[in-house]
Curated annotation (Swiss-Prot):
Subcellular location: Nucleus; Cytoplasm
Gene Ontology MF, one: zinc ion binding
Main localisation: nucleus
Biased composition (Basic and acidic residues): 185-200
Gene3D superfamilies to which the protein is assigned, alphabetical: Classic Zinc Finger
Purpose of the protein: Transcriptional corepressor which does not bind directly to DNA and may regulate transcription through recruitment of histone deacetylases to gene promoters. Regulates cell adhesion, migration and proliferation. Involved in specification of the lateral neural plate border (NPB). May be required for segmental gene expression during hindbrain development.
Biased composition regions of type Polar residues, renumbered to the chain: 173-182, 204-217, 230-239
Entry's family note: Belongs to the Elbow/Noc family.
Name of this protein: Zinc finger protein 703-A
């Protein structure tokens, strides 16, 4: 075959290129020749066809994982943020390792066995500190929670097992936390028995380790509950119904029905006006406890909680919880979580101990009808519950024979005052002893009339003594002082009735119309409290 000229067909070129030797010696085509360029493949296509795919998939993803349960977090050496996030998510819903290796000083071999047993359960090792524990405070998180639980049990009079004896993990029922720490202090309590138990202890173990605050509260509350019968022996067992519904038990995802905060037992109904005044209905339509009974919530709660030696008017939580738990409670008397439940219908009780701490009202739902509405329409001299005002702010919770219906709502740094007075004049005289504003005379000097000055001194809690009065308490401005304290402030929920004080005549304000700033937010408070968000 003759050598094809440069413009020949590509078939001849393909035939000559496919044969091993050319038919006739012909000059080699240049690389830029169009025939050679037409037969070329793109370099990208060649690379895609001939490239090895090993760099796309790592070998650990191609090979199956070993049969031993290896946590996938260990592949990243627990250093990447994604591994920390996955480790935190993997611990949700799983109990912590058995607490025996954390409570007592055990040998290293027992620590290793405890670590291996926790790994078999699919959990993280003991020394792992990367998981998020909301109630822990640093490095000694779990040891501190376990030892504090044991320490509070020591103070409460429990028989805690000695250091050489490993305590048995808590049983799921909250009552066994009261009486069973020392039941299994024998030679049978070893690692094998420990490995059999965690499946039955998932609920209580998780909350007792992840929530040390609730654990302390529940142990101290149950210790006060069991203080009637002296020390709890290892053989004494209490069945779960004996705890009642007032027991402070931690919330567990495996056990619904336990409440965190102390609740009255189911046999006690709330006073009718507590539901009525908060839900916006008159108390006559809410069938609660009788108005004439003197043994109301303040008298029945301490007995059912098992607190001996407490007067009926004392708080049901007094002495039942550590100070840290008591500080967490709401100190606002308008809140339903307020713990001084003493004078709710117990004013005519002859056995009450009327000390200053017991004089604090439990639920003083004294909501006036409006800031500029006279309280005399609802606080009549006969103290009969009147519904002529706003239906939200009823006084139906008052008893007919209550001699001291007026309550001081002043709140300072030491807590609410909550003193009771028979008349509104005594209440106003008492309010003038609380605080004095420096420069109060300058503030009142700009008001046009003396009647407005007296009314403003009444509503601003300004004593007539001035800044040099001996009753001046600097820095104790109340959280509950009315919103007229800052007349120039913007109040988004206000009606704008006191925004122009200079031209507003207020001669019709009586001396008894002391009101609370909660009247402005009464609608929001009642809706929130009716839903349980207090």
């Amino acid at each position: 075959m003759n050598c094809s000229p440069p413009g020949s067909s590509t078939d001849t070129e393909r035939q000559s290129s496919s044969s091993g030797t050319p038919a006739t010696p012909c000059p080699t085509l240049a690389p830029t020749h169009p025939v050679r360029q037409a037969n070329r493949l793109p370099i990208r296509l060649i690379n895609m066809l001939t490239a090895h795919t090993g760099h796309l998939l790592h070998p650990e993803y191609l090979q199956p994982l070993s049969s031993t349960p290896i946590s996938p977090i260990e592949l990243d050496a627990k250093k990447s943020p994604l591994a920390l996030l996955a480790q935190t998510c993997s611990q949700i819903g799983k109990p912590d390792p058995p607490p025996s290796s954390k409570l007592n000083s055990v040998t290293s071999s027992e620590k290793e066995s405890g670590r291996s047993s926790s790994l078999k359960l699919g959990e993280s090792p003991l020394e792992d500190k990367s998981s998020f524990k909301p109630y822990s405070k640093g490095g000694e998180t779990r040891k501190e929670s376990g030892s504090s639980a044991g320490g509070s049990a020591d103070k409460a009079g429990f028989r805690v097992p000695s250091g050489s004896c490993q305590p048995f993990p808590h049983a799921p029922s909250p009552s066994s936390r009261v009486s069973s720490p020392g039941q299994h202090c024998d030679s049978k309590n070893n690692e094998s028995q420990e490995k059999k138990e965690p499946e039955a202890n998932k609920g209580s173990l998780e909350t007792s380790q992840a929530n040390p605050t609730l654990t302390r509260a529940s142990i101290s509350n149950s210790s006060a509950e069991s203080s009637q019968s002296g020390d709890v022996t290892p053989s004494s067992k209490s069945d779960p119904p004996s705890l009642g519904s007032g027991h402070v038990a931690p919330v567990s995802p495996y056990k619904p029905g336990h409440s965190v905060f102390p609740l009255p037992p189911s046999g006690i109904g709330y006073h009718g006006s507590i539901v009525g005044a908060y839900a916006g209905y008159p108390s006559q339509y809410v069938h609660g406890l009788d108005h004439t009974k003197t043994s109301l919530v303040g008298n029945q709660l301490p007995g059912t909680l098992g607190l001996p030696g407490k007067p009926p008017s004392s708080s049901p939580l007094t002495g039942a919880s550590p100070p840290s738990f008591m500080q967490g409670l709401c100190r606002d008397p308008y809140c339903l979580s307020y713990h001084n439940a003493s004078h709710l219908g117990s004013s005519s009780c002859s056995t009450c101990v009327h000390d200053p701490s017991a004089l604090k009202s439990g639920y003083p739902l004294v909501y006036p009808s409006h800031p500029l509405h006279s309280v005399h329409t609802t606080m009549s001299s006969s103290v009969t519950p009147s519904l002529s005002g706003h239906p939200l702010y009823t006084y139906g919770f008052m008893l007919q024979n209550d001699p001291v219906p007026h309550i001081c709502n002043w709140v300072s740094a030491s807590g609410p005052c909550d003193k009771r007075f028979a008349t509104s004049e005594e209440l106003l005289a008492h309010l003038r002893t609380h605080t004095a504003l420096p420069g109060a005379d300058k503030l009142l000097a700009g008001y046009p009339t003396s009647s407005f000055g007296s009314a403003a001194s009444c509503h601003l809690h300004l004593p007539p003594g001035g800044p040099g009065s001996p009753t001046t308490l600097p820095g104790s401005l109340s959280l509950r002082s009315p919103h007229t304290l800052g007349l120039s402030r913007y109040h988004p929920y206000g009606k704008g009735h006191l925004t122009t004080p200079s031209g507003l005549p207020v001669p019709s304000l009586p001396a008894g119309s002391y009101y609370s700033p909660y009247a402005l937010y009464g609608q929001r408070l009642t809706s929130a409290s009716a839903l349980g968000y207090q």
